């Protein structure tokens, strides 16, 4: 993700982030299935999706910690 996309994610509400996280997890499942069957065209997409999942989880955790501090 680019810096601009990360800023957009940070300004999103947790419900939207959770929905996006679910979509990315489903996409990762499909990519892994395609990899196992030999149909995956772009193996780098798996890395990109995993990185996006980690970034969204980090943003959700930051929001959670910020809420606990207040």
From Swiss-Prot:
InterPro entries in UniProt: Ribosomal_protein_uL29 (IPR050063), Ribosomal_uL29 (IPR001854), Ribosomal_uL29_CS (IPR018254), Ribosomal_uL29_sf (IPR036049)
Protein name per Swiss-Prot or TrEMBL: Large ribosomal subunit protein uL29
Pfam families: Ribosomal_L29
GO molecular function, one term: structural constituent of ribosome
Superkingdom: Bacteria
Gene that produces this protein: rpmC
HAMAP family: Ribosomal_uL29 (MF_00374)
UniProt KW keywords: Ribonucleoprotein, Ribosomal protein
Biological processes annotated in GO: translation
Organism encoding this protein: Clostridium botulinum (strain Eklund 17B / Type B)
Similarity comment: family membership: Belongs to the universal ribosomal protein uL29 family.
